[in-house]
């Protein structure tokens, strides 16, 4: 009888140690995920373009990229294709 109780207590102790180790690994995983998310916030911001792309807001044709022209469309002026082709 004493041997059975000893085996049960020993089994519970082993289970407790295994659960604690698993919990420590999970905590480390949470920390690693948090660090990755923090690093993703440091992504560089897109740089401002030197020309306005298709459907972009413009004030004159020189603002638009090649083959685009600034046209007055409601509710604002936008860059649209000027009909030209080529490089």
Swiss-Prot record:
Locations listed in the record: Secreted
Keyword Signal included in the entry's annotation: yes
Signal peptide coordinates: 1-24
Residue numbers covered by the propeptide annotation in the UniProt entry: 25-49
Primary location group: secreted
Modification Valine amide, positions: 85
Tissues where the protein occurs: Expressed by the venom gland.
Cystine pairings recorded for this chain: 51-65, 58-70, 64-79
Any one GO molecular-function label of the UniProt entry: potassium channel inhibitor activity
Highest taxon listed in the record's lineage: Eukaryota
One Pfam family hit: Toxin_12
GO CC term, one of those recorded: extracellular region
Keyword set, alphabetical order: Amidation, Calcium channel impairing toxin, Disulfide bond, Ion channel impairing toxin, Knottin, Neurotoxin, Potassium channel impairing toxin, Secreted, Signal, Toxin, Voltage-gated calcium channel impairing toxin, Voltage-gated potassium channel impairing toxin, Voltage-gated sodium channel impairing toxin
Function statement: Inhibits P/Q- (Cav2.1/CACNA1A) and N-type (Cav2.2/CACNA1B) voltage-gated calcium channel by modifying voltage-dependent gating. It selectively and reversibly blocks the calcium channels coupled to glutamate release. Also inhibits potassium channels (Kv2.1/KCNB1) with lower affinity. Has also been shown to weakly inhibit Kv11.1/KCNH2/ERG1, Kv1.2/KCNA2, Kv1.3/KCNA3, Nav1.5/SCN5A, Nav1.7/SCN9A and TRPV1.
Domain notes for this protein: The presence of a 'disulfide through disulfide knot' structurally defines this protein as a knottin.
Protein name: Omega-theraphotoxin-Gr1a
Organism, as annotated: Grammostola rosea
Taxonomic classification: Eukaryota, Metazoa, Ecdysozoa, Arthropoda, Chelicerata
């Amino acid at each position: 009888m004493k041997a059975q109780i000893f085996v049960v207590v020993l089994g519970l102790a082993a289970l407790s140690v295994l659960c604690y180790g698993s919990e420590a690994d999970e905590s480390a995983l949470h920390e690693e995920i948090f660090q990755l998310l923090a690093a993703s916030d440091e992504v560089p911001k897109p740089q401002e373009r030197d020309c306005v792309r298709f459907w972009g807001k413009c004030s004159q044709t020189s603002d638009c990229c090649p083959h685009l022209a600034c046209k007055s469309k409601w509710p604002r002026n936008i860059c649209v294709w000027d009909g030209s082709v080529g490089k």
